């Protein structure tokens, strides 16, 4: 089994798109023995882009997961079963080298598969509108960056929290 992708990410007027992180995230949810990912930083005539909230990962995940859904539909395979069969798990080596520790992807997929919302058939609507159900997997690094906050318990029992993070 193999995976291949060519990614071209808009950098704006200067180099520095999230091309590398997109390449590392593209197939990160899947265990496959062979792969090739070419990722390009495309400089264009407009303002510089900058990282915000998992740069490159959503774009790569959308592309890969869309193709996975198309494969499942053409092959008549349940999307969660396909993902479970090919899921990265503890011990899986990513294409760029690191080996996963416990990541919980299989457990999440199994929980989704067994949930009533997934088991319930999607009925046709009397008003002619179409309904569906989607499944996707995604990945981002746990880099262990340090953050902090200052918590103050006030005399009246209220608590104040000050942090430099938007989260």
Segments and roles (model prediction):
Residues 1-60, 126-167:
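Gly/Pro-rich active-site capping loops and adjacent beta-alpha segments
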Residues 1-3, 79-80, 119-122:
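Acidic/polar loop patches that form or flank catalytic/metal-binding clefts of enzymes
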Residues 51-118:
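N-terminal leader/propeptide and maturation segments of large enzyme subunits in energy/redox metabolism
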Residues 94, 107-126, 150-154, 158-162:
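Intrinsic disorder at enzyme termini
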